[in-house]
Amino acid sequence: RDEAFVRAECARLNVPLRVFHPADVGVAVPAHPGEDWARKLRYACFDALRAGGIDAVATAHTATDQTETLLFRLARGAGLHGAAGIRPSRPGFCRPLLCLTRAETEQVCTACGQRWVTDETNASDAYARNRLRHAALPALRSVNEAAEENFARFCEKAARADAYFAQ
């Protein structure tokens, strides 16, 4: 479903598309693939693109993803480096949407008439990140509507402090 949607949108917008499957990048599919496996697969695909001459990959991580990542890492005992969250850039990668929440990106897409698809696994509470998304984020928003933006700013400050202490 997701691949078909992306193929159709890329064709409509005349955007080149390269589709990878696990075997294309030498990633074995485990009996029970989970979030960590999916992330490794995505980055193996990104690495294959870069090896094929693509200079950089822009991901669609948002301030909402940043908040989820921070909460997830803190719950697992992260220190300052982990509290820096998703970095805006690193060699070969940029994340231009970190300044917008998921709701804001959806508003922009709606205003521009751009459709999107939501990964159906996002609805399942089988994944820790989804449990944070479904329970913690609404609770935080009830305390402060700007919670996601505030968490994103905290991650920026943590990244600066982490870089300072790494010198």
Give, region by region, the residue ranges found by the protein language model:
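Core alpha/beta nucleotide-donor-binding catalytic domains of modification enzymes
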Residues: 1-138
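ATP/NTP-dependent adenylation/nucleotidyl-transfer catalytic domains that generate, transfer
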Residues: 127-167
